[in-house]
């Protein structure tokens, strides 16, 4: 595996093709805050439109939701209330139990939580299981007010925390491999036992490369 680290602040409409065209998959990593958000969203659009395998982790998943809202559903102002509290389309919003939290230190949704996977989904094929548990570190989540519209347009919630009805995993119906996860699979991945998401992501990259060679 040859890794290419690309700072999202270097990605814009004029540089995206040059920076991203030769990649066999694109990972948008976790993070916080507004810095580099526009570049992440542009990279995700490139992956979606060019059928490049994509994995978004935590903020990376949230950026995928924002990108889809803006460029597929036409929610031009779609954003997370973390970056834009007054957005007309808060497709990512603070979790209900976090709204009255004043002290931010150590008060995020932390730790291991269960997740139910949608039968027949790509993610269920990755895990080969119907129920999983993954570790979390976040305050913001997919806004279920928009879930029906997203699913009708092809972005499907394929992993849910049934206890709180939280969207934990999204994937695109008409894409070879496009998955976003709210949790952190890297917390459960080691050299000796790599996480199945990363294993399948690399397999998707290999398949993409083979198709480009043809």
Predicted regions and their residues:
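Sparse, context-dependent recognition of short Cys/His-centered cofactor- or disulfide-binding micro-motifs
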Residues: 11, 54, 68, 76, ...
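Conserved beta-loop-beta connector loops within the AMP-binding
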Residues: 122-132
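Cysteine-nucleophile active-site neighborhood
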Residues: 18-114, 119-122, 198-209
């Amino acid at each position: 595996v040859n890794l290419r680290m690309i700072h999202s602040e270097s990605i814009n409409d004029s540089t995206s093709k040059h920076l991203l065209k030769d990649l066999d998959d694109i990972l948008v990593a976790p993070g916080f805050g507004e810095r580099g958000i526009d570049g992440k969203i542009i990279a995700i659009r490139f992956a979606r439109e060019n059928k490049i395998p994509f994995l978004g982790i935590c903020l990376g998943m949230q950026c995928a939701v924002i990108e889809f809202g803006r460029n597929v559903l036409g929610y031009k102002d779609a954003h997370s209330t973390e970056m834009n509290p007054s957005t007309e389309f808060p497709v990512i919003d603070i979790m209900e139990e976090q709204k009255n939290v004043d002290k931010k230190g150590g008060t995020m949704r932390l730790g291991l939580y269960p997740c139910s996977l949608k039968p027949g989904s790509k993610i269920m094929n990755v895990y080969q299981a119907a129920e999983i548990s993954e570790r979390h570190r976040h305050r913001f989540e997919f806004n279920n007010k928009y879930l029906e519209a997203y699913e009708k347009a092809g972005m499907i919630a394929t992993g849910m925390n049934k206890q709180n009805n939280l969207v934990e995993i999204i994937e695109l119906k008409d894409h070879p491999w496009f998955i976003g996860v709210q949790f952190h699979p890297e917390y459960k991945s080691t050299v000796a036992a790599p996480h199945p998401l990363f294993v399948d992501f690399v397999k998707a990259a290999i398949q993409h490369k083979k198709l480009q060679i043809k």
